[in-house]
Design a protein with these regions (language model features):
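Gly/Ser/Thr-rich active-site loops/lids in small-molecule metabolic enzymes
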Residues: 22, 95-97, 150-169, 202, ...
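Short, charged, surface-exposed secondary-structure boundary motifs
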Residues: 103-108, 163-165, 205-210
Length: 332
């Protein structure tokens, strides 16, 4: 059922495939078809890095107090270590779907889709938890639900994380994708940081972080890349623990903490199914022909139109046959 949404991520020399990903993927495809692989004479050995990873987290994360946490692993890979780790960093941990099951019997492990957070919301409200954390299928993304059971979209928790970094390191650079709220950019600037908007996609975010030596990066899908105090890759468990660390220094509830970053009237990602050829034609025609007065056009990835109090966005998905849209305004 989920096969169309699965895939393989390639990295070259610790980087994503970057702006020339299409050419690089086609070259890899050709090598695979020709069975052209390098053959070494080394030895293969099995090693576990579980304890080394846990030790690294223990070294990097310091909590002033422990919170009551609900963790939804979505039956994904985060089920292996997630409960053990979050239990150590929580006053009380309520586990949801923390057994690996690739058929995903409870919900699809995509925290960017609000319907996949319904069980987490119910559990947070039932147990009166401080925060709910959802991991995606491979554990590199996260979704957040506050103490009132409200979904906190990634650009809002990126705002909190950005503020935390900028309180310690002024003029740090923060990378985010074109789907993020203007509130994030304003938060970064308010706290004397340097906002960098880039294309949507793991490879593009990672490339911009490396090019600009940015302290933090993230996108609306829930990928968070900590380059300050971590290793610059997207890690849902570390990002979740970092959130707990930030919240542990607050006397306010999680809901009150996020109220500092107002939730504008906005949509989640809206996906319109189409075919791969047509989606790029639509974007090309819009860029060339749709130029409404009073709006600033940003075309680094699809088309983003920014007005004085609102913006709208459309792009062609790189990974699925669909168009992706999002809208935001100060009023409804």
């Amino acid at each position: 059922f989920f096969q169309a949404e699965d895939g393989i991520r390639y990295c070259l020399l610790s980087r994503g495939l970057g702006d020339v990903y299409k050419r690089q993927i086609l070259l890899l495809k050709k090598r695979i078809e020709n069975n052209h692989f390098l053959a070494g004479k080394g030895k293969l050995s099995d090693q576990s890095f579980d304890q080394k990873y846990i030790d690294a987290l223990n070294e990097k994360i310091t909590l002033k107090k422990k919170l009551k946490v609900v963790l939804d692993c979505g039956n994904g890979a985060g089920s292996v270590l997630g409960p053990t780790i979050f239990k150590k960093f929580s006053d009380e941990l309520i586990e949801l779907f923390c057994k690996v099951d690739g058929s995903f019997p409870n919900h699809h492990p995509d925290p960017s889709d609000p319907k996949n957070l319904s069980d987490l919301i119910k559990a947070v409200e039932l147990h009166k938890a401080d925060v709910g954390i959802a991991l995606d299928g491979d554990g590199d993304r996260l979704g957040i639900v506050d103490s009132d059971g409200e979904i906190i979209y990634p650009d809002r928790y990126l705002s909190l994380m950005s503020k935390d970094i900028l309180e310690r390191y002024k003029k740090s650079k923060i990378v985010f994708d074109v789907k993020c709220s203007n509130q994030l950019k304003q938060t970064i600037e308010k706290h004397k940081g340097i906002p960098i908007m880039t294309k949507t996609g793991h490879s593009f975010i990672k490339s911009e972080i490396k090019k600009n030596n940015a302290a933090l990066g993230g996108e609306m899908s829930g990928h968070i890349f900590y380059n300050e105090g971590w290793y610059g890759f997207d890690d849902g468990i570390f990002s979740g623990l970092k959130l707990l660390e930030i919240l542990s220094n607050q006397e306010k509830t999680t809901h009150e903490v996020f109220n500092e970053f107002p939730n504008m009237f906005n949509t989640p990602e809206i996906k319109i199914s189409t075919d791969d050829k047509y989606k790029f034609e639509v974007i090309s025609k819009l860029k060339n022909n749709f130029k409404p007065e009073g709006f600033n056009a940003i075309t680094i990835d699809g088309l983003r139109l920014e007005g004085p109090r609102s913006w709208g966005f459309i792009r062609a998905s790189n990974t699925t046959p669909s168009l992706v849209l999002r809208f935001e305004a100060e009023t409804n």
